[in-house]
Design a protein with these regions (language model features):
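PLP-dependent aminotransferase class I/II
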Residues: 1-153
């Protein structure tokens, strides 16, 4: 699946597929993730969180408060949330990268040793459908839908 995602996404500006950092590593790619450049414009990003909050508070990555205060200090960028919402509308389930543990309410008072990497990845990352039942045709459809959600002007 990763090889096909890599091939189909290689020329999509603003999207980077996570891969092995060097030949010393050999990922099993049980989860394929992409990073969206913060400058990448995605259809609907101006209202991405508004639409999600209206649907279900807590449904958006990082939303943990009532709708009057729907944003937190650690949430995916609007273009990531807009891509997730856009893919969902096309029948594709995706999700933000995991929210850093030290930013989750249950761990807010626990000691944490952080350097900012987990927060920065959470803001720009999106998990794509992966696994043995994701066919080549599925991957092609997913990438096509990603492209359709990008504003190219």
């Amino acid at each position: 699946t990763c090889d096909l995602y890599r091939e189909l996404l290689k020329d999509v500006r603003g999207i980077t597929l996570h891969e092995n950092p060097s030949g010393r590593f050999d990922s099993n790619y049980w989860l394929n993730t992409i990073v969206l450049d913060p400058l990448l414009r995605v259809k609907g990003q101006e209202n991405a969180y508004q639409a999600t909050v209206q649907g279900a508070v807590g449904g958006a990555g990082g939303v943990t408060h009532a709708a009057v205060n729907a944003h937190t200090d650690c949430e995916p960028n609007a273009n990531v949330e807009a891509m997730r919402v856009g893919l969902d509308a096309m029948g594709i389930e995706s999700r933000p990268l995991w929210k850093p543990m030290h930013k989750q309410p249950v761990y807010k008072d626990c000691p944490a040793y952080v350097n900012g990497v987990s927060e920065s990845l959470f803001k720009v990352g999106l998990c794509l459908p992966s696994g043995p039942y994701v066919t080549d045709e599925d991957v092609a459809y997913i990438v096509d839908c990603i492209k359709k959600n990008i504003c190219y002007n």
